[in-house]
């Protein structure tokens, strides 16, 4: 046999296999609901608890008090109103977390740009979404919004945020880290973490490490980041990425899914844009954009969840405000 033809026969199956792999389509985002039962909103609290998705409060506009309703769903499509007027009032950009088998909501903003506006440092908990207990009227950390709170190594950690939403300045931004065993009593872990003061950022826990990334400030001095920081103890932080490939942004969402950190959506002022992208990383250093054929429209201050082995996206500002729900399911061996 001619050696040239023999070589082509051996190589052809390899090229053909690689080509098939490259053409394998990515799973699309699926629209679960065009209009959920709750009023379109952004900046709401979100949780997964006792086999349900939960939406708490949020923002309709800057000239009314924020909503105090609580909604739950077992499938993302059909929603039940659990409470119309929860006792907490600071429900714009609150921090929410499930801890000690309870739903917790803390911090947040009240009354938009109206007189009597304020930030909070109260902590509330509930086991059913209807009955809420005031765990702490005034935690040791200063009243603030748009911080992050995570469970990490058996304790709650609260990081960053801003003390004054529409009327603050750079001094209102925080880069402190607080820790609590029970959500009531908090201790200062570090007054100035290595990352710059910021709000509207996100945090994640993966492989025994805690990450802080993105965020910045909205007004009056806008700035946004796309850096990534990591810690193994909540106190000592190191920068692993100065500028991730996703554009710097605030008001985005994040989850951990399939052992990757995900960054989704958000807003930037330069360019002035709501982002509709999704990026994932296993280490905060190397990022890949997820680009299926069908995805959700760009938005900011939406909710994201990991529920029933899928990522869910709900609500947010396009504009207009929306109350749609989307989901993405990736194979377990993806």
Model-identified regions with their sequence ranges:
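Sec-dependent N-terminal signal peptides
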Residues: 5-14
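N-terminal secretory signal peptides that target proteins for export/translocation
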Residues: 1-2
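Intrinsically disordered, low-complexity Ser/Thr- and Pro-rich stretches
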Residues: 13-16, 231
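Sec/Tat signal peptide C-region and signal peptidase I cleavage site
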Residues: 18-22
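Kelch-like beta-propeller repeat domains
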Residues: 23-334
């Amino acid at each position: 046999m001619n050696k040239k033809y023999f070589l082509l026969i051996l190589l052809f199956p390899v090229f053909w296999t690689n080509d098939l792999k490259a053409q394998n389509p990515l799973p699309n985002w699926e629209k679960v609901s065009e209009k959920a039962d709750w009023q379109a909103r952004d900046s709401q609290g979100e949780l997964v608890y006792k086999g349900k998705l939960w939406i708490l409060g949020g923002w309709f506009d800057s000239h009314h008090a924020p909503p105090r309703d609580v909604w739950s769903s077992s499938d993302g499509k059909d929603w039940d109103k659990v409470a119309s007027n929860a006792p907490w009032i600071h429900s714009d950009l609150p921090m929410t977390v499930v801890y000690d088998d309870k739903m917790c909501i803390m911090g947040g903003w009240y009354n938009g740009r109206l007189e009597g506006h304020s930030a909070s440092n109260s902590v509330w908990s509930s086991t059913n979404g209807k009955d809420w207990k005031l765990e702490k009227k005034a935690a040791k950390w200063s009243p603030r919004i748009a911080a992050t709170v995570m469970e990490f190594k058996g304790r709650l950690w609260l990081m960053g945020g801003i003390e004054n939403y529409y009327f603050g300045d750079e001094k209102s931004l925080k880069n402190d880290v607080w820790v609590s065993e029970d959500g009531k009593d908090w201790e200062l872990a570090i007054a100035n973490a290595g990352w710059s003061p910021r709000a509207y950022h996100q945090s994640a826990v993966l492989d025994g490490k805690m990450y802080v990334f993105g965020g910045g400030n909205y007004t009056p001095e806008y700035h946004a980041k796309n850096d990534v920081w990591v810690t193994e103890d909540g106190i000592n932080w190191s920068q692993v990425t100065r500028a991730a490939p996703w554009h710097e942004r605030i008001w985005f969402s994040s989850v951990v899914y399939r052992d990757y950190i995900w960054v989704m959506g958000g807003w930037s002022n330069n360019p002035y844009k709501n982002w509709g992208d999704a990026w994932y990383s296993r280490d905060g250093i190397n990022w890949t954009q997820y680009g299926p054929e069908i995805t959700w429209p760009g938005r900011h201050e939406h909710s994201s969840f990991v529920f029933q082995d899928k990522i869910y996206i709900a609500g947010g500002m396009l504009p207009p405000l929306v109350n749609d729900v989307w989901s993405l399911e990736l194979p377990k061996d993806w």
